[in-house]
Amino acid sequence: MGSRKSTMTFIEESARNLPPLAFTPQPMDFDHPPVDPVAECERWFAEAWRLPTPNPNAMTLATSTTRGVPSARTVLLKAFDAHGAVFFTNRESRKGEELRANPVAEVLFHWDQLGRQLRIAGAVTELDDADSDAYFATRPRDSQIGAWASDQSRPLESRETLLGRVMASIERYDGSDVPRPAHWGGYRIALDTIEFWQAHPFRIHDRVVYRRSGTNWLTTRLFP
């Protein structure tokens, strides 16, 4: 259609020389999906944790304003069970503000070596102080200091300003434990929707989505 010649430069898809896996992942039967998607998530996580790559628990977290304006960033999964997927962050950040106003979110895991994607979406709730305190106590001290020094997502005049705040926090808590800031804590994303995606040659991928219905799951296979 039309006579205009495209001037776009496209990213070429070339064969990627990924290192071979040291184990054989167990394939999922997309024709007969498992009854329990939570157990299948845990199996996929267990296999991803065996990858020779850093942060296999990294996930893209998507939130939005009440007007539907989206934003996304990478966070780390810190706990997972039948109640949901847990991560921690500054609650006064942009994502914290959006979750307070519009408490729903979706996360996406992408494990290139396994040819897999996993999506989890649902309502979001804040963890209580006890759980947030317990996790904060396990963090490296430098990370604890950073939680005090950074007004996440706020304008910053210079890096020197940030480093000055880091030094001030180091001096403030010299010789004592670093307490959890009141503005820092955990969130849990309910498992309302779970989608499994497995790559195959020529884009003939497998997809299956689970949607919670009361205490049951409705399963639908999707075109790729």
Q: What is each residue range found by the language model?
A:
Residues G2-P224:
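Binding-site signature for planar aromatic cofactors or substrates
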